[in-house]
């Protein structure tokens, strides 16, 4: 049993560090407007003008923060910091508190409603 669990852990870590995290670092970083692209097509192309959602951004923050905490790679810290900055700069409502549900591609507020679901991820 211990061998099976160890093997599964190794496979999952390999998938995470060899595929999942590199995909986000290499294909989803929005170098024009900051943060990460809101959407890509089924063939991996950016969808211009796609909105960005707070839940996805918060999940990216959690994922890269956790990856850095466990694996201590500076590139993961850089991505976590990028996601945190996006959350604070564009999703956080500096006037009334809480987080916007979504922002436009350029980071301007789009759907300004406050949902407890989104707040849970942002916290």
Predicted segments, located by residue:
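Glycan-recognition and catalytic cores of secretory/periplasmic carbohydrate-active enzymes
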Residues: 1-123
């Amino acid at each position: 049993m211990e061998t099976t669990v160890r093997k599964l852990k190794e496979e999952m870590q390999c998938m995470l560090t060899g595929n999942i995290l590199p995909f986000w670092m290499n294909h989803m970083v929005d170098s024009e407007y900051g943060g990460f692209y809101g959407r890509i097509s089924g063939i991996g192309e950016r969808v211009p003008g796609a909105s960005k959602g707070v839940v996805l951004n918060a999940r990216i923050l959690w994922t890269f923060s956790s990856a850095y905490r466990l694996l201590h790679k500076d590139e993961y810290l850089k991505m976590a910091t990028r996601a945190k900055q996006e959350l604070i700069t564009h999703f956080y409502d500096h006037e009334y508190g809480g987080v916007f549900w979504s922002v436009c591609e350029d980071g301007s507020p789009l759907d300004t409603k406050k949902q407890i679901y989104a707040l849970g991820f942002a916290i």
